[in-house]
Amino acid sequence: MKEKYPLRVEEWKKKIEKYERHRGRKPSFPALLVVDVQKFFFSPDSHAYIPSLSLVLPNINKLLQGFRKKNLPVVFTYYAWKEGEDKGSMGRWWKDAVMEGEERAKPLVAPHRGEKILRKPHYSAFYKTDLEEYLKDKGVKDVVICGVMTHLCCETTARDAFMRGFDVYFVMDATATFNEELHLSSLLTLSHGFAVMVETEEVIRWLS
C-alpha cells in the first residue's frame, strides 16, 4: 500500500484538467495551513510513515519562507489526543492514538514566534478548534494547504474550509500520503468541488 512516489505534477495536471473548475485564480489575503508535519508520519518505524513526505518537505519549507517574508498568517496543526479525551469514531477507526507530549507528536518543522500552533484530534483542522475564528479575526479570505495526509486530514480540512466560506488553494507538490493513487484521487475530487490546485512555485510567484 505504501510507496515513495515521485512528484509527477505535470501528469497530475493533465489528469485533473477535465474535472477542475478553476485554474489561474490568485488569493487576496491567504494564510498557510501546515497540516500535521510531525514525527508520527516521518519515522520509518511508525505504522503511519509516509515515504514521500521527505520529497515534499523542501516545498513546505519554501512556502513557509514565502509566507514569512510577506508577514502572512501561518498555522501549524498536529494530530494528538489528550489523556482522558473521548476518541469517538477516530479511536474506533484507527485504534492507535498519538497522545499529547509523545515524541511522535512533535513537529518536523519549527514554528516561528507568533505563528499559531493548533492541536487537532480529528481529520479537520476546523473541527472543535478555534481556527475559523482565528483566521476571520485576521481578515483571511483564502487558505493555502500543505502537509499530510493528502486524502485524510488535508482533504477534510480543505472541504471544511470551503464550507466555512474560505477560498481554498491545495498545493499538489507540498502534500503527501501513502501512495500516488490516494494522492491523485484527492486532487481529482478537490479540484472539481472544493479547491484550486496549485504548485509550490506558483504560490511563490504570487508572493514575490
Q: Where are each of the predicted segments found?
A:
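Active-site acidic carboxylates
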Residues: 1-113, 208
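Glycine-centered short loops/turns at secondary-structure junctions
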Residues: 69-72, 139, 165
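A short glycine-rich beta-strand->turn/loop micro-motif centered on a GG-aromatic cluster
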Residues: 144-147, 167-180
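Short glycine/serine/threonine-rich phosphate/pyrophosphate-binding segments
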Residues: 151-157
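Active-site-proximal loop->helix
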Residues: 179-191
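A charged, well-structured terminal subsegment
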Residues: 196-208
